[in-house]
């Protein structure tokens, strides 16, 4: 990596159509804040930019359901989420809005520049039009039957039952959500961004980061690149959003697609931050200086938007320029998912713990620490109330809080609240803690985004400090050797300071309270200054003889009793019971036998044994596999919605049951010549039916 003088950290914009939950916090906002606070603690020049994503169809649907305007919807959730972030200690330097005029101006500027260069393509396509409502229908406004699993309530963008990504025109029996009428296909023109034009440049960009990006990010991005990048629409027929800024009849009633608009918020919000800081050109130092570094914190469901699409937009802007060139992200630390009590967070089923509601009951730092210790870096993790209780009580209260309080109380009671001894560097280094190595480990962990390790290292120091104080027994030693007890307490107080510094990025409010108990004026945030590294202070004792601490200690963490989490556990029981009822109802529906058919009707279905010769994922359809089958002497291609449960490699060589005389159809631009049989288990997993036997390929199943 090149020499870096400043760092710009961005976080994926939460959608202003609902409250953020703990899964969002764990995946994006907390790790970003911990990283930013560490960079500040090192004295580095870093800014933290975030904001609300306030455009898109789900917002207009919510507004129509509630009989209010889209602006009312985003105002509500922007306020709610920004306040929840503030209470949680997420320290944005600027938290913007994509509905702001400043953002609209930036997005239009990018559109016009890329349009001026002739990069966009205009394409006429057939989209559904609701004649009753007199408007084109975006994907979420169309519902119908899924062509893969026959779910009658599939949406125009995805079937929630089988997970297949769809387009509205693939639905069977489509209906408009606006009028319940059957929509008709009409021609409409849209602007497209040619991602394929930048394929080679994007491949080189990803290759340059294959050793410093997380493997999941590199692998997922390369899967898309391997499939080949296609043109992607950047406009849609909608009234809510950023209007296409052209004096052109074809631009009327069209807005920028949210995938193009939202990522530009990182730039527009940085511009707005600079303007409010009194220097309208300051943003350029973070976006356009080659010695600046951009880091995008995201969840794994946002990877390609930040490793392919956003970089391609910036490449399009930079093309042919000698100045005003934007930096591409230096790292895109995408997390896995944090689940809740063994299941995925689900807003639609209200199976979630919302951040604002959580903070009404429990302190922010207990949550920050619990999530940091369970950060989903390389695999999905799980938030449970029991684990939260155990970490708060056993680690924060009994280990960290207990040590701090004992140290402050004993100093106040036996040494009049004054540091009683001047510790030397040699004294500091015989504690059993290698401070140079600790600083090196912390720095490596932060720079590699190992959030769990950073929190764990801090708690390891707390355990060592607690052990040192307990084994030294100053309450006994003081009776015979006051100086030895004084030395113990001076070292303990310096350990309190070291813990405040070490754990500041993870539990900043608690670090500030420790800092205040140690007798320092002002806040610990004010102590963290650009150009001065607080982390280097760990190398030597910082509290010297005669320094006065605060006379009163405080309990840093109140233990969480069973009664405190009992309402939450009961709430989970109800949510799980409701989910089980839905699953039981679905199972009951599945167990209802279909109407009786005649034997002649049964004979019409031609079931054959087929062998899978090849398998691959279908482009931009995460749940579909394209199977190449051998059926006797014939070759067939079949699409199957099983990619979530079987890898292509697992399918090759399997014998499957093929519905051989099913009418051919086109799905996602691919021909499917039949259907293979699978069974859905109670857990939702699809299991392919595999006939067993030798030399049965092509044989009819009777």
UniProtKB/Swiss-Prot annotation:
Gene3D superfamilies listed in its UniProt record: HUPs (3.40.50.620), Isoleucyl-tRNA Synthetase, Domain 1 (1.10.730.10), Methionyl-tRNA synthetase, Zn-domain (2.20.28.20), Nucleic acid-binding proteins (2.40.50.140)
GO cellular component: cytosol
UniProt keywords, alphabetically: Aminoacyl-tRNA synthetase, ATP-binding, Cytoplasm, Ligase, Metal-binding, Nucleotide-binding, Protein biosynthesis, RNA-binding, tRNA-binding, Zinc
Function recorded in the entry: Is required not only for elongation of protein synthesis but also for the initiation of all mRNA translation through initiator tRNA(fMet) aminoacylation.
Enzyme class: ligase
E.C. number: 6.1.1.10
Motif 'KMSKS' region in this chain: 344-348
Encoding gene, per UniProt annotation: metG
Any single biological process term in GO: methionyl-tRNA aminoacylation
Organism for this UniProt entry: Chlorobium limicola (strain DSM 245 / NBRC 103803 / 6330)
Residues that coordinate or bind Zn(2+): 146, 149, 159, 162
UniProt GO molecular function: ATP binding; metal ion binding; methionine-tRNA ligase activity; tRNA binding
Residue stretches making up the tRNA-binding domain: 601-702
Quaternary structure note: Homodimer.
Reactions catalysed, as given in the entry: tRNA(Met) + L-methionine + ATP = L-methionyl-tRNA(Met) + AMP + diphosphate
Disulphide bonds in the chain: none
Recorded superkingdom: Bacteria
Family from the record: Belongs to the class-I aminoacyl-tRNA synthetase family. MetG type 1 subfamily.
Pfam families from the UniProt entry: Anticodon_3 (PF19303), tRNA-synt_1g (PF09334), tRNA_bind (PF01588)
Cofactor(s) required, per the database record: Zn(2+)
Cofactor note: Binds 1 zinc ion per subunit.
Principal subcellular localization: cytoplasm
The protein, known as: Methionine--tRNA ligase
Location of the motif 'HIGH' region: 14-24
């Amino acid at each position: 990596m090149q020499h870096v003088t400043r760092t710009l950290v961005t976080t994926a914009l939460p959608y202003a159509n609902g409250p953020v939950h703990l899964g969002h916090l764990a995946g994006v906002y907390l790790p970003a804040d911990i990283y930013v606070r560490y960079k500040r603690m090192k004295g580095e020049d870093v800014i933290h930019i975030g904001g609300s994503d306030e455009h898109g169809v789900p917002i207009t649907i919510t507004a129509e359901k509630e009989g209010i305007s889209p602006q009312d919807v985003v105002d509500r959730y922007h306020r709610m989420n920004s306040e929840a972030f503030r209470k949680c200690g997420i320290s944005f330097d600027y938290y913007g809005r994509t509905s702001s005029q400043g953002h609209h101006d930036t997005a239009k500027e990018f559109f016009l520049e890329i349009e001026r260069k002739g990069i966009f393509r205009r394409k006429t396509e057939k989209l559904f039009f609701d004649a009753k409502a007199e408007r084109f229908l975006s994907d979420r406004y169309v519902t119908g039957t899924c062509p893969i699993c026959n779910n009658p309530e599939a949406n125009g963008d995805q079937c929630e039952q089988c997970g297949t990504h769809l387009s509205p025109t693939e639905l069977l029996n489509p209906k408009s959500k606006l009028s319940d009428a059957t929509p008709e296909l009409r021609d409409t023109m849209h602007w497209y961004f040619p991602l394929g034009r930048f394929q080679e440049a994007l491949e080189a960009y990803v290759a340059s980061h294959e050793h410093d990006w997380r493997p999941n990010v590199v692998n997922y991005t390369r899967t898309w690149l391997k499939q080949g990048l296609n043109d992607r629409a950047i406009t849609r027929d909608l009234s809510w959003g950023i209007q296409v800024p052209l004096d052109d009849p074809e631009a009327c009633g069209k807005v920028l697609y949210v995938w193009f608009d939202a990522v530009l918020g990182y730039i527009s919000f940085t511009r707005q931050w600079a303007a409010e800081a009194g220097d309208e050109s300051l943003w350029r130092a973070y976006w356009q200086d080659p010695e600046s570094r951009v880091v995008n914190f995201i969840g794994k469901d946002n990877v390609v938007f930040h490793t392919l699409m956003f970089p391609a937009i910036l490449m399009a802007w930079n093309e042919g320029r000698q100045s005003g060139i934007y930096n591409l992200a230096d790292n895109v630390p995408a997390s896995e998912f944090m689940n809740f009590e063994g299941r995925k967070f689900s807003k639609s089923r209200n199976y979630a713990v919302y951040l604002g509601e959580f903070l009404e009951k429990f302190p922010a730092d207990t949550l920050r620490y619990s999530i940091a210790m369970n950060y989903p870096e390389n695999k999905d993790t799980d938030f449970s109330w029991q684990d939260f209780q155990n970490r708060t009580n056993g680690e924060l209260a009994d280990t960290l809080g207990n040590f701090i309080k004992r140290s402050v109380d004993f100093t106040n009671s036996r040494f009049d609240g004054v540091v009683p001894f001047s510790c030397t560097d040699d004294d500091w280094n015989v504690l059993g803690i290698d401070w140079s190595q600790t600083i090196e480990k912390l720095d490596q962990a932060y720079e590699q985004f190992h959030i769990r390790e950073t929190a764990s290292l801090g708690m390891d120091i707390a355990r060592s400090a607690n052990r040192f104080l307990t084994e030294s027994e100053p309450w006994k030693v003081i009776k015979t050797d006051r100086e030895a007890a004084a030395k113990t307490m001076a070292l303990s107080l310096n350990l309190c300071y070291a813990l405040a510094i070490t754990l500041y990025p993870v539990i900043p409010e608690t670090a500030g309270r420790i800092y205040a108990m140690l007798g320092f004026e002002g806040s610990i945030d004010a102590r963290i200054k650009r150009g001065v590294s607080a982390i280097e202070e760990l190398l030597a004792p910082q509290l010297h003889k005669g320094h006065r601490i605060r006379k009163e200690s405080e309990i840093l963490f109140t233990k969480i009793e069973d009664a405190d989490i009992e309402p939450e556990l009961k709430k989970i029981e109800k949510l799980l019971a409701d989910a089980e009822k839905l699953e039981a109802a679905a199972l009951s529906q599945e167990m209802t036998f279909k109407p009786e058919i005649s034997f002649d009707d049964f004979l019409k279905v031609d079931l054959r044994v087929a062998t899978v010769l090849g398998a691959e994922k279908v482009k931009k359809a995460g749940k579909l596999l394209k199977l190449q089958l051998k059926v006797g002497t014939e070759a067939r291609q079949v699409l199957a919605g099983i990619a979530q449960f079987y890898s292509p490699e697992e399918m090759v060589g399997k014998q499957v049951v093929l519905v051989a005389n099913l009418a051919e159809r086109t799905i996602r631009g691919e021909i499917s010549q039949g259907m293979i049989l699978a069974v859905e288990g109670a857990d939702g997993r699809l299991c392919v039916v595999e006939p067993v036997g030798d030399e049965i390929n092509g044989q009819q199943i009777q």
